[in-house]
């Protein structure tokens, strides 16, 4: 038997029903907020992710790349490892005339995992707000993400906030090399004792500030204001990002949005420049995003600020109950026929479909338990309609009578 690739999954009919349900809720939410749907190709040039330094070397090791050969020469391309960077490229290519662009999309993301235990193909629902740099723009995206999850039936969504520039300002005082800063941040998150001991000895004020940020989870702007007050002389480099962070959470406070300030949640801050947020449902990480004001100019575009987020479809699919999708599950009608009545069966099936109802031809082996009604065409003027749930049967002479009945305008 030929097996599927490691780290890849088949989406079965029930999975796809959940997939489309989640996607439709997200799309509907985005449209009502003024976002327009776009789609980027699965293949992008590798240079899109390397020339601007938008992804760390560690991330680039996980991309699927190959040579797009045209006979004499070629350029290396990748299966997109990220959704935001292609969306930024799309804006630069085709939408620069828009001062403010609200874009949304569904895309698959490919990242290599050596073990094959983690998914190598992941589906994301993304939204990008380009051209606005205010804290209100961050709040719009966070609110849109929370609204989508609420409409999907998720309660008590946990919102964790961090700030990329605050992380970078702290790390810059420890290590000037940007690539090394990522390693140090990972060490801090892992509680590296030697590093923390060195920091406490060499930079005691910075150590106290960092310890406060790493060990405490604030739930209001007051927490950040206290951090700034306690930073002392070490707070010089931290003042600007802290003020920006405070401005962002102030807006969320006004909107009544609950959150947790968690500097450690900023892991993976490669191209982010401001507020970073992550969303959790029952401890499962289901989405995240943030501000990336330098990405579009880094890619050769105009100096446009931007922010965005993604919801992780692969993680949301198993969390959706069938009952939540009731409106998506249409009643299905089973069409049977006797003798030489195939043409009549097709006619009545087409009429049913024109009413927006699913009609399927019966074949041996079909499980009738999945259907609410069955229509058996016995003759051109004889239609047997059976309520499979109530086990009631009615004979009708006209196709119009059948449609009238199945539309629920008359009881069987």
Curated annotation (Swiss-Prot):
Signal peptide feature range = none
Q: Which UniProt keywords apply?
A: Amino-acid biosynthesis, Cytoplasm, Histidine biosynthesis
Q: What is its main location?
A: cytoplasm
Q: Where are the transmembrane segments?
A: none
Looking up Pfam families in the UniProt record yields:
tRNA-synt_His
Any GO BP annotation: L-histidine biosynthetic process
Q: Which domain of life is it from?
A: Bacteria
**InterPro entries, per database record:** aa-tRNA-synth_II, aa-tRNA-synth_II/BPL/LPL, HisRS-like_core, HisRS/HisZ, HisZ
* Cellular compartment(s): Cytoplasm
PANTHER family, per database record = HISTIDINE--TRNA LIGASE, MITOCHONDRIAL-RELATED, HISTIDYL-TRNA SYNTHETASE
**HAMAP family on file:** HisZ
Miscellaneous comment:
This function is generally fulfilled by the C-terminal part of HisG, which is missing in some bacteria such as this one.
Record-given protein name? ATP phosphoribosyltransferase regulatory subunit
The beginning of the lineage is:
Bacteria, Bacillati, Chloroflexota, Dehalococcoidia, Dehalococcoidales
Q: Which gene encodes it?
A: hisZ
